[in-house]
């Protein structure tokens, strides 16, 4: 039974019903419907912390989905899973791929900045201030791009940029 048919919570059930209605109303191909079903099942599994299942669904959605914009969100979600698993290098790869297809994803820039900032903090703990500074500068660049796309978001990042004199 597909995950989308066994949702337990109200929000997932509501989303599934609305999505199914839209798929019937909006003219789409069978392939697009299948891709969306895998994507939806991936989101459901991801929200429950079932990352392996989510990845399987996302990879299947990627195999079927041809629209670059839709693919960007699949890639972004794969990046989120790798971030959650502490696989930061892999996460960055997927965020980059998402941005190649959709450069208007401020959340991808933000997540890349968070990873770079984390790596900068790690470098400080290892006593490597030069590497730390490089990571922090990279984080600043990504946060600036995220803020340019969503100026009212990422207030903590904006404050960090001001405090560290990287807002220029």
UniProtKB/Swiss-Prot annotation:
GO terms for cellular component: chloroplast thylakoid membrane. It is a peripheral membrane protein. Signal peptide: none annotated. One of its GO terms (biological process) is photosynthesis. InterPro entries: PSI_Ycf3_assembly, TPR-like_helical_dom_sf, TPR_rpt, Ycf3/AcsC/BcsC/TPR_MFPF. It comes from the Eukaryota. Keywords: Chloroplast, Membrane, Photosynthesis, Plastid, Repeat, Thylakoid, TPR repeat. It is found in: Plastid, Chloroplast thylakoid membrane. The keyword Plastid applies. Its main location: plastid. Pfam families: TPR_1. TPR repeats lie at residues 35-68, 72-105, 120-153. The keyword Plastid applies. Gene3D superfamilies: Tetratricopeptide repeat domain. Belongs to the Ycf3 family. Essential for the assembly of the photosystem I (PSI) complex. May act as a chaperone-like factor to guide the assembly of the PSI subunits. This is Photosystem I assembly protein Ycf3. It comes from Physcomitrium patens (Spreading-leaved earth moss).
